[in-house]
Amino acid sequence: MIYISMFKFLFKILIGEIMIKLLYEGILIRENGIIKKASSSSTLIITDNNNIIVDTSTKDMENIIIKGLSELNLSPNDIDVVINTHLHYDHIENNPIFKNATFYASPKEFGFNDNFEDFKKFKDKEIEIIETPGHTYGSISVIYKDYVVVGDASPLKNNILKMIPPKLNVDEKLALESLKKIRKLRKNVITGHEGIVYKEKLL
């Protein structure tokens, strides 16, 4: 069965046992090259063993995230795991609402502390986490079935579509290599700030 519901900020895909929901697709606004507004995407993944959030976006998106969860009869207290693709503020500000979650990130990230576990310790047979550095040295991406949530390895659709490294990066060469790695996966890409790029566009 395939059920797809799309509207302004939410979409949901159920394909057999696949459950992934984009709670918020993200936004990135620049004026004259200066970032004026940045809120990351936030993705819910439900596996047999865990309710997982990948990135929690900014505080002003809290109600959108909670509403998206409620549509599946979930609340923040039902989330077992939060995986942060990196630790920039626009990807982590709602972490505190997930009171029962264990938080995972890369120890290479500036800001990694005792609130986080090393992502390599996370175990779920349905999830693979890979390193995709460039935007930051510790950037990671989360693979689930036919989807990969990439954070700011590809903040916007054109980054992955046209193989353009993100403007904000610590190492442009690493960023490009990460984009190549993501393309080779041949999966639907959930970007950091602009929703989804379907794999058919990446062939």
Curated annotation (Swiss-Prot):
Manner of cofactor binding, per the entry note: Binds 2 Zn(2+) ions per subunit.
Domain of life: Archaea
Enzyme Commission (EC) number: 3.-.-.-
CDD domains: MBLAC1-like_MBL-fold
PANTHER family noted in UniProt: METALLO-BETA-LACTAMASE DOMAIN-CONTAINING, METALLO-HYDROLASE MJ0296-RELATED
Positions that bind Zn(2+) 1: 86, 88, 135, 152
The protein's enzyme class: hydrolase
SMART domains per UniProt: Lactamase_B
Keyword Nucleus (UniProt): no
Entry protein name: Probable metallo-hydrolase MJ0296
Protein source organism: Methanocaldococcus jannaschii (strain ATCC 43067 / DSM 2661 / JAL-1 / JCM 10045 / NBRC 100440)
InterPro entries in the cross-refs: Metallo-B-lactamas, NDM-1-like, RibonucZ/Hydroxyglut_hydro
Intrachain S-S bonds: none
